[in-house]
Amino acid sequence: MKPDVNVLLAAARGDHPQHEVARTWLEGALVAAASGASFTLMPMVVASFLRLATSPRIFQVPTPIDVAVGFIDSLVASAGVTMATLGPEWLLLRRLCVDKRLGGNDLPDAWLAAATLHLGEHLVSFDRNFVKLLGRAQFTRLSSATA
């Protein structure tokens, strides 16, 4: 499994409306990773998490950078958690962009979907847009407790 940025943000911030759902999923995924299940952090997701969590445009009280980095560090230090090495996913990203006629704000999701396909992983997100990029075998959409 690999979490999308919205899952990490919700899990990390107690004031997030989807905190409980995300935190419960994350805790379960970390237990599973310690028992041998896949849990992969994507570099683009980590960078987006740091950018969004620390932004005063996103949160009235942004997460201090040392706290945000500490959250990621704690995940990386957890048993069974890995950080992906990327690069060869370009051909899949290219194909998704051309076949699905993607551009603009679709590109970060397309890059994450391409990396998910390349690595043979499974993505978890609150974002419904991944349905058009990944099949059921590669994607789980978490439901919000507030939705």
Language model features with spans:
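Conserved glycosyltransferase catalytic-site signature
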Residues: V5, D106-A110
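Short active-site oxyanion
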Residues: S35-F39, G80-V81, L117-H122
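Short, well-structured N-terminal submotif of metal-dependent ribonuclease cores
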Residues: M1-L41, P56-G70, T146-A147
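Acidic catalytic patch
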Residues: G14, T40-V46, D73-K100
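Acidic, PIN/NYN-like endoribonuclease modules and their adjacent C-terminal/linker elements
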Residues: P88, A113-A147
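Short, flexible helix/strand-to-coil boundary loops that buttress conserved ligand/catalytic motifs
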Residues: A12, A53, L134-A137
